[in-house]
Amino acid sequence: GAGGAVAAAELADAGLDVVVLEQGHHWTSADFTQREDEMMPRLFEEGGMRQTEDGSIIVMQGRCVGGSTVHNLCYAFRTPDPILRMWRDEHGLGELTTEAMAAPFERVERNLKVKQIRDDEVNAMNQAIRRGTEALGWSGFVTKHNREACVQSGYCILGCSYDAKQSMLVTYVPRAERAGARVLSNARADRIDVSDGRVRGVVGRVVDHAGIPGACIDVRAKVVVLAAGAIASPDLLLRSRIANRSGQVGR
Protein backbone atom coordinates (compact mmCIF):
# COMPACT_ATOMS: atom_id res chain seq x y z
CA GLY A 1 0.00 0.00 0.00
CA ALA A 2 0.90 3.67 0.31
CA GLY A 3 3.29 3.24 3.23
CA GLY A 4 5.08 0.06 2.19
CA ALA A 5 5.43 0.90 -1.50
CA VAL A 6 6.95 4.33 -0.86
CA ALA A 7 9.36 2.88 1.71
CA ALA A 8 10.33 0.04 -0.64
CA ALA A 9 11.01 2.40 -3.55
CA GLU A 10 13.04 4.87 -1.51
CA LEU A 11 15.12 2.15 0.17
CA ALA A 12 15.71 0.25 -3.09
CA ASP A 13 16.71 3.49 -4.81
CA ALA A 14 19.25 3.98 -2.02
CA GLY A 15 20.84 0.64 -2.93
CA LEU A 16 19.45 -1.52 -0.13
CA ASP A 17 18.30 -5.11 -0.60
CA VAL A 18 14.50 -4.93 -0.24
CA VAL A 19 11.90 -7.70 0.01
CA VAL A 20 8.20 -6.79 0.12
CA LEU A 21 5.60 -9.22 1.48
CA GLU A 22 2.00 -8.66 0.36
CA GLN A 23 -0.79 -10.97 1.45
CA GLY A 24 -2.92 -10.19 -1.60
CA HIS A 25 -2.47 -11.02 -5.26
CA HIS A 26 -0.65 -8.90 -7.85
CA TRP A 27 -3.59 -7.89 -10.01
CA THR A 28 -3.13 -5.44 -12.89
CA SER A 29 -5.47 -3.24 -14.92
CA ALA A 30 -6.02 -6.15 -17.32
CA ASP A 31 -7.71 -8.00 -14.44
CA PHE A 32 -10.05 -5.14 -13.44
CA THR A 33 -13.40 -6.12 -14.94
CA GLN A 34 -15.55 -3.33 -13.43
CA ARG A 35 -17.82 -6.03 -11.98
CA GLU A 36 -18.51 -5.86 -8.25
CA ASP A 37 -19.09 -9.60 -7.91
CA GLU A 38 -15.63 -10.31 -9.35
CA MET A 39 -13.54 -7.43 -8.02
CA MET A 40 -14.75 -7.11 -4.42
CA PRO A 41 -13.44 -10.57 -3.42
CA ARG A 42 -10.18 -9.92 -5.28
CA LEU A 43 -9.31 -6.51 -3.86
CA PHE A 44 -10.81 -6.49 -0.35
CA GLU A 45 -10.50 -8.42 2.87
CA GLU A 46 -13.64 -10.53 3.33
CA GLY A 47 -14.96 -9.31 -0.01
CA GLY A 48 -15.35 -5.77 1.28
CA MET A 49 -17.67 -6.86 4.10
CA ARG A 50 -15.19 -6.80 6.99
CA GLN A 51 -16.89 -5.02 9.87
CA THR A 52 -16.56 -4.04 13.50
CA GLU A 53 -17.62 -6.51 16.18
CA ASP A 54 -21.02 -4.85 16.62
CA GLY A 55 -21.58 -4.68 12.86
CA SER A 56 -22.00 -0.91 12.88
CA ILE A 57 -19.08 -0.04 10.59
CA ILE A 58 -17.86 -1.74 7.41
CA VAL A 59 -14.09 -1.51 6.93
CA MET A 60 -12.95 -1.38 3.30
CA GLN A 61 -9.55 -2.99 3.82
CA GLY A 62 -7.45 -3.61 0.71
CA ARG A 63 -5.81 -6.95 -0.01
CA CYS A 64 -3.66 -6.71 -3.14
CA VAL A 65 -0.37 -5.30 -4.37
CA GLY A 66 -0.95 -1.56 -4.13
CA GLY A 67 -3.20 -1.93 -1.10
CA SER A 68 -6.02 0.53 -0.54
CA THR A 69 -4.60 2.89 -3.19
CA VAL A 70 -5.92 0.44 -5.81
CA HIS A 71 -9.53 0.93 -4.68
CA ASN A 72 -9.56 4.40 -3.13
CA LEU A 73 -11.06 7.48 -4.80
CA CYS A 74 -7.76 9.27 -5.50
CA TYR A 75 -8.29 12.32 -3.32
CA ALA A 76 -4.82 13.64 -2.55
CA PHE A 77 -4.49 16.34 0.08
CA ARG A 78 -1.65 17.08 2.44
CA THR A 79 -1.86 16.35 6.15
CA PRO A 80 -3.75 19.40 7.51
CA ASP A 81 -1.82 21.83 9.70
CA PRO A 82 -4.02 21.15 12.79
CA ILE A 83 -3.13 17.45 12.57
CA LEU A 84 0.59 18.19 12.24
CA ARG A 85 0.25 20.51 15.23
CA MET A 86 -1.45 17.80 17.28
CA TRP A 87 1.32 15.33 16.41
CA ARG A 88 3.92 17.87 17.54
CA ASP A 89 2.15 18.99 20.71
CA GLU A 90 0.68 15.71 21.92
CA HIS A 91 3.09 13.11 20.56
CA GLY A 92 6.47 14.84 20.65
CA LEU A 93 7.01 14.83 16.88
CA GLY A 94 8.48 18.31 16.82
CA GLU A 95 10.15 17.88 13.43
CA LEU A 96 6.81 17.55 11.61
CA THR A 97 6.30 21.22 10.86
CA THR A 98 4.45 22.54 7.83
CA GLU A 99 7.71 23.91 6.48
CA ALA A 100 9.65 20.68 7.00
CA MET A 101 6.94 18.59 5.33
CA ALA A 102 6.57 20.83 2.26
CA ALA A 103 9.43 19.32 0.22
CA PRO A 104 8.50 15.64 0.91
CA PHE A 105 4.87 16.38 0.04
CA GLU A 106 5.92 18.07 -3.20
CA ARG A 107 8.11 15.10 -4.18
CA VAL A 108 5.30 12.60 -3.61
CA GLU A 109 2.83 14.84 -5.45
CA ARG A 110 5.12 14.92 -8.48
CA ASN A 111 5.50 11.15 -8.45
CA LEU A 112 1.73 10.66 -8.22
CA LYS A 113 0.91 13.41 -10.73
CA VAL A 114 -1.30 15.17 -8.20
CA LYS A 115 -3.33 18.01 -9.67
CA GLN A 116 -6.29 20.21 -8.82
CA ILE A 117 -9.72 18.85 -9.76
CA ARG A 118 -11.16 21.22 -12.36
CA ASP A 119 -14.54 22.90 -11.90
CA ASP A 120 -15.92 21.07 -14.95
CA GLU A 121 -15.04 17.77 -13.24
CA VAL A 122 -17.15 18.58 -10.15
CA ASN A 123 -20.50 16.80 -10.47
CA ALA A 124 -23.91 18.26 -9.64
CA MET A 125 -24.08 16.67 -6.20
CA ASN A 126 -20.78 18.17 -5.10
CA GLN A 127 -21.67 21.52 -6.62
CA ALA A 128 -24.77 21.49 -4.40
CA ILE A 129 -22.65 20.63 -1.37
CA ARG A 130 -20.32 23.52 -2.18
CA ARG A 131 -23.26 25.93 -2.41
CA GLY A 132 -24.54 24.64 0.90
CA THR A 133 -21.23 25.12 2.70
CA GLU A 134 -20.96 28.65 1.34
CA ALA A 135 -24.52 29.47 2.42
CA LEU A 136 -23.81 28.18 5.93
CA GLY A 137 -20.53 30.05 6.15
CA TRP A 138 -18.55 26.82 6.49
CA SER A 139 -15.11 26.30 5.02
CA GLY A 140 -14.76 23.90 2.13
CA PHE A 141 -12.63 23.35 -0.93
CA VAL A 142 -12.33 21.23 -4.05
CA THR A 143 -9.51 18.82 -3.34
CA LYS A 144 -6.71 17.58 -5.56
CA HIS A 145 -6.50 14.10 -7.05
CA ASN A 146 -3.89 11.73 -8.45
CA ARG A 147 -5.38 10.75 -11.80
CA GLU A 148 -3.81 11.11 -15.23
CA ALA A 149 -5.98 11.13 -18.38
CA CYS A 150 -9.03 9.96 -16.44
CA VAL A 151 -11.90 8.73 -18.65
CA GLN A 152 -14.42 9.16 -15.78
CA SER A 153 -15.70 5.61 -16.00
CA GLY A 154 -16.80 5.77 -12.36
CA TYR A 155 -15.30 2.45 -11.26
CA CYS A 156 -12.45 3.74 -9.07
CA ILE A 157 -13.40 1.49 -6.17
CA LEU A 158 -12.97 -1.64 -8.33
CA GLY A 159 -9.50 -0.77 -9.60
CA CYS A 160 -8.75 1.40 -12.62
CA SER A 161 -8.97 -0.51 -15.90
CA TYR A 162 -7.17 2.33 -17.67
CA ASP A 163 -4.20 2.89 -15.32
CA ALA A 164 -5.34 6.50 -15.00
CA LYS A 165 -5.42 6.23 -11.22
CA GLN A 166 -1.86 6.80 -10.04
CA SER A 167 -1.97 4.13 -7.36
CA MET A 168 1.04 2.39 -5.86
CA LEU A 169 0.36 -0.39 -8.39
CA VAL A 170 1.47 1.82 -11.29
CA THR A 171 3.85 4.23 -9.52
CA TYR A 172 5.94 3.27 -6.51
CA VAL A 173 5.73 -0.54 -6.81
CA PRO A 174 7.16 -0.61 -10.38
CA ARG A 175 9.75 1.95 -9.32
CA ALA A 176 10.80 -0.25 -6.40
CA GLU A 177 11.05 -3.29 -8.70
CA ARG A 178 13.14 -1.37 -11.23
CA ALA A 179 15.54 -0.52 -8.40
CA GLY A 180 15.86 -4.20 -7.50
CA ALA A 181 13.21 -4.73 -4.82
CA ARG A 182 11.55 -8.15 -4.80
CA VAL A 183 7.78 -7.95 -4.36
CA LEU A 184 6.30 -11.25 -3.16
CA SER A 185 2.53 -11.36 -3.56
CA ASN A 186 0.29 -13.97 -1.91
CA ALA A 187 2.78 -13.85 0.97
CA ARG A 188 1.19 -13.37 4.39
CA ALA A 189 3.30 -12.10 7.29
CA ASP A 190 2.27 -13.98 10.44
CA ARG A 191 4.90 -12.89 12.92
CA ILE A 192 7.85 -10.53 13.26
CA ASP A 193 10.74 -12.62 14.54
CA VAL A 194 12.60 -11.17 17.53
CA SER A 195 15.73 -12.56 19.18
CA ASP A 196 17.82 -11.03 21.97
CA GLY A 197 15.76 -7.87 21.86
CA ARG A 198 16.25 -7.25 18.14
CA VAL A 199 14.05 -7.83 15.13
CA ARG A 200 15.58 -10.56 12.96
CA GLY A 201 13.02 -10.97 10.19
CA VAL A 202 9.49 -12.03 9.32
CA VAL A 203 7.85 -15.46 9.36
CA GLY A 204 4.74 -16.16 7.30
CA ARG A 205 2.98 -18.37 4.78
CA VAL A 206 2.17 -18.43 1.10
CA VAL A 207 -1.62 -18.06 0.72
CA ASP A 208 -3.93 -18.59 -2.24
CA HIS A 209 -6.74 -16.26 -3.36
CA ALA A 210 -9.06 -17.77 -0.75
CA GLY A 211 -6.52 -17.19 2.01
CA ILE A 212 -5.71 -20.88 2.42
CA PRO A 213 -2.10 -21.19 3.68
CA GLY A 214 0.59 -23.16 1.90
CA ALA A 215 4.39 -23.15 2.15
CA CYS A 216 6.21 -21.36 4.96
CA ILE A 217 8.13 -18.11 4.41
CA ASP A 218 11.11 -17.02 6.50
CA VAL A 219 12.75 -13.71 5.58
CA ARG A 220 15.88 -12.68 7.48
CA ALA A 221 16.35 -8.91 7.65
CA LYS A 222 18.32 -6.31 9.57
CA VAL A 223 15.37 -3.92 9.42
CA VAL A 224 11.64 -4.64 9.13
CA VAL A 225 9.23 -1.91 7.96
CA LEU A 226 5.69 -2.64 9.13
CA ALA A 227 3.20 -0.99 6.76
CA ALA A 228 0.06 -3.09 6.94
CA GLY A 229 -2.48 -0.35 7.61
CA ALA A 230 -4.48 0.68 10.66
CA ILE A 231 -5.90 -2.80 11.31
CA ALA A 232 -3.31 -5.33 10.21
CA SER A 233 -0.30 -3.44 11.62
CA PRO A 234 -1.42 -3.53 15.28
CA ASP A 235 -2.69 -7.08 14.76
CA LEU A 236 0.78 -8.18 13.63
CA LEU A 237 2.43 -6.36 16.53
CA LEU A 238 0.12 -8.09 19.00
CA ARG A 239 0.74 -11.52 17.47
CA SER A 240 4.48 -10.83 17.59
CA ARG A 241 4.24 -9.58 21.19
CA ILE A 242 6.36 -6.52 20.51
CA ALA A 243 6.14 -2.71 20.70
CA ASN A 244 3.27 -2.69 23.20
CA ARG A 245 4.86 -1.46 26.39
CA SER A 246 2.09 1.14 26.64
CA GLY A 247 -0.65 -1.45 26.29
CA GLN A 248 -2.34 0.79 23.72
CA VAL A 249 -1.59 -1.15 20.52
CA GLY A 250 -4.86 -2.00 18.80
CA ARG A 251 -6.94 0.26 21.04
What do these predicted regions represent?
Residues 20, 58, 62-63, 150, ...:
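Short glycine- and Lys/Arg-enriched binding-loop motifs that mark or flank ligand-binding interfaces
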Residues 28-36:
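Accessory recognition modules or surfaces
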Residues 35-39, 159-160:
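Short, hinge-like loop/turn segments at secondary-structure boundaries
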